Amino acid sequence: MLEERHGATAGRASAGLVAALFERELASYLRVPDVVAVSSATVGIHLALQTCGVGPGTEVIVPSQTFAATIQPIVALGAVPRFIDHSPGTLCVEAEAVKEAITPATRAVLPVLYGGRPVDLTSIASDLRHQNIHIVEDAAQAFGSPRTGVQALTVYSFGPIKQLTALVGGAVVPRTVEEAEALRQSRSLGITSSQTDRIRTTTYCVQGPGLRGVLSDVNAAVGRVQLARFETVAVLRRELWNAYAQALRDAPGVAVIDVGNDAVPFNCVVRVPGRNRVHGIMRDRGVGVGVHYPPNHLQPAFARWTRSLPITERTAEEILSLPFHPAMTCHDARWTAAALLEAMARPPG
């Protein structure tokens, strides 16, 4: 198997030659100077925020409608998540909502590129920069989607169901050489020397805080093979999303969450009335629908930072994720759309 041959060249499962090659290939694909591979997007968000100086006494502006993995790094760093509402049509934050949420304690903005949709904060980027507020993009669902050009640390996920998979893993796109160096050090427990260098010496230096966050060569090998075929996967995902959108375009009561024309979609999410009932009917029929995600500001772990977010709370009762993966066909999407409409039309009781 090609992944196995790639991984074997490194001679070990930990980070090494193959991970470094994967980083260079990612940088070339994304057309950026450097990419720092990490063990997960959650680790990537943690390290990116840490690099920006997020810690006790600081706040991070973040949407509530996201996976808990976006929020936990903020809390782990001792900072405060300042939850904000999103646009009901995209489930992404907008510049004006970010601007209104800024306080003297704000150190970073963490937009979530929901479903693969880019979040454009260009209109406030200059204001944020002048206030020393950093942008860290949670692009866990957005590999392959266009980048907006705003100076941001961008974090990708290479989990098993993502557009690009390494089975597990992620990557951070740094803005500067200094950030790249800081990220590489902090992903290695704050140790300044590489593992290869350490086995040749009797000591090493721990320069600062860090996590065990390196991407293994085994996972990097999988990622390299998947990157080589990514354009094919991207086409399949766009075709599948468009098939859903076409099938549901004129359906009464259904709103398809828009990911934008150029995105590589991660999923297809709709808003429907009576979501819980529809969800149950479709699950009973064997259709793998889901909900992504319950709002974080209503979770017990984050209750101390809850705020009134009426849009988030309304859409949270309506969103439904339809089955979505590149092994599906457009026929599958049309069948699922028809099943959704049948479930919605079924009388209650």
Residues covered by each model-derived region:
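Phosphate-binding glycine-rich loop
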Residues: 6-13, 17-59, 73-77, 83-85
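PLP-dependent aminotransferase class I/II
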Residues: 17-24, 32-35, 96, 108-112, ...
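Conserved active-site segment immediately N-terminal to the catalytic lysine
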Residues: 137-166, 195, 202-207
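Structural detector of well-ordered beta-strand residues that form the stable sheet scaffold
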Residues: 36, 61, 82, 134-136, ...
